[in-house]
Design a protein with these regions (language model features):
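Subset of outer-membrane beta-barrel
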Residues: 24-475
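Bacterial Sec-dependent N-terminal signal peptides
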Residues: 1-27, 369
């Protein structure tokens, strides 16, 4: 039993550790009028001036989870810790503190180029960005099995997932006021896929009885890279099978046409951001509302390699072929055979070949409202609701803001949010005089860590910063 337990726990650790560091746009900047990039959260938002940035516009890194180390380590004795597996930890206390699905997600984004200017009675934006997202999902059943063991006769671990999407986008946006107070905006994004991978266990069930165990599983995986050249490995002039990577093409040929054809992206797509904002003006002085839908689109991968397991079962009815003259040797052979069966069950050897495949982006919705104080227009309070639509790695969040702008070129925001990943504190400082603009902030703050700087509670951390060159006067 310990062998199977530790095999499954090892799989859990691998999936959790596979999560990479990643980022998202700063929601803390949503209501700051001096921000040059809140149009990425709502295309209807108009920067106060034209602007330009190269490589320094925005850098953002974030990671979130709905669990932390405090879910698995418990105080014991005098200044000691023990794991959830200890008999001193009550199983109901441990399991009731866990969410049904343990989620971890992360995002990285950066603006390589940013440009904004007034045109045709509105405001036009152009940008090139890099985006990377990773999400993992683990069912609670894993830890229920590890803690309870034989107390239950069956366990289901279906719903294990690990996904990563990496792409570049070329963005063109436009916004304008259509009637007094009402502003609309749209951003079109041409997407270039860089890498994609998805691992999903849609069935993993364990049935246990006194005389045998039965494990049933099915898993799938898909993977694609930026470009995978279809070239004859010898002649280098036949664009048919077998395919070889672009790096090998560059090392074996100097023909410009061959290299250019090899460098064509293997994945392309299109997405749109939509936004609207309304200032109530004299109807309700100081009140404005806004809404946006982001990442409505998909990427088409030309060379997606797909794998799957066949529906498999592993049955273990005990160890009965023990040689009394070689107890340790024969026991090792039995356990080794069992381990090989489990390894085969989790391996994904069956390839369905390379084929075109479409992956949808995970859309995000924002609904916002802001009220400027009548006694001091540099002070406002606001609320923002956000939702990410995704099978795995989705979230809901409500965030309350206090925004302060004591001078035209200095503004700050402090906010508190409650989301799928718990309660968090965010902040943003924006310094934007005439010659340059600098901002730094965070949507998620880690408030408690171990002596080894490991977050104690939910792993919610984020940092974003950037420098932009303003152009022209405020308007």
């Amino acid at each position: 039993m310990k062998t199977i337990k530790y095999s499954l726990i090892t799989l859990v650790a691998f999936i959790l550790c596979a999560t990479n560091s990643n980022a998202q746009m700063a929601k803390s900047a949503y209501f700051l009028d001096g921000s040059f990039y809140n149009h990425q959260l709502n295309p209807a938002m108009k920067p106060e001036r034209a602007y330009f940035s190269l490589l320094t516009g925005t850098w953002s890194v974030a990671a979130n989870s709905n669990f932390g180390i405090s879910n698995f380590l418990y105080p014991y004795g005098d200044d000691k810790l023990t794991t959830f597996m200890s008999s001193h930890v009550d199983q109901d206390e441990f399991l009731n503190a866990l969410p049904n699905s343990l989620q971890m997600s992360s995002d990285i984004s950066t603006n390589l180029l940013g440009l904004g200017f007034r045109m045709f009675g509105g405001f036009t934006t152009f940008g090139i960005t890099l985006n990377s997202s990773v999400s993992t999902n683990l069912p609670k059943g894993f830890f229920e099995f590890a803690k309870k063991g034989f107390q239950e006769s069956s366990y289901s671990f279906s719903g294990i997932n690990m996904n990563t999407m990496n792409y570049a986008s070329i963005n063109l946006g436009y916004s304008r006021e259509v009637v007094e107070g009402l502003r609309v905006g749209v951003t079109a994004k041409y997407l270039v896929g860089l890498a994609y991978a998805n691992f999903n266990v849609d069935k993993l069930n364990i049935e246990m009885s006194e005389d045998k165990w039965m494990i049933e599983s099915h898993a799938t995986a898909e993977a694609a890279l930026y470009t995978e050249m279809s070239v004859d490995a010898g002649a280098m002039d036949d664009l048919n099978e077998p395919r070889i990577p672009l790096a090998d093409v560059l090392s074996n040929t100097t023909d410009v046409n061959t290299i250019m054809q090899a460098a064509k992206p293997a994945a392309k797509g299109l997405a749109f951001d939509l936004g609207v904002s309304y200032d109530f003006g004299d109807l309700v002085d100081g009140l404005s509302v806004s809404a946006s839908l982001l990442d409505l689109g998909s990427i088409n991968w030309q060379y997606m390699t797909k794998f799957s397991t066949e529906d498999g079962k592993v049955e273990f009815d005990g160890i009965d072929e023990i040689d009394p003259n070689d107890f340790e040797g024969s026991l090792d052979k039995e356990l080794e055979a069992l381990g090989e069966d489990i390894e085969k069950m989790f391996s994904i050897p069956y390839s369905h070949g390379t084929q075109a495949y479409r992956t949808k982006l995970s859309p995000v919705m924002y609904l916002g409202a802001e009220y400027n104080m009548p006694f001091y227009h540099g002070l406002s309070v606001a609320m923002l609701y956000g939702k990410r639509f995704a099978t795995y790695g989705g979230w809901d969040e409500v965030r309350g803001y206090v925004n302060l702008a004591p001078l035209k070129w200095i503004e700050a925001s402090a906010n508190v949010g409650y989301s799928t990943y718990g309660t968090t504190f965010g902040w943003m400082f924006n310094f934007h005089p005439r010659l340059f603009s600098f901002f730094i902030g965070s949507d998620y703050m880690v408030t408690k860590v171990t002596p080894q700087y490991i977050p104690v509670n939910n792993i919610n951390g984020h940092i974003t910063f950037g420098i932009t060159k303003p152009i022209g006067k405020r308007k």
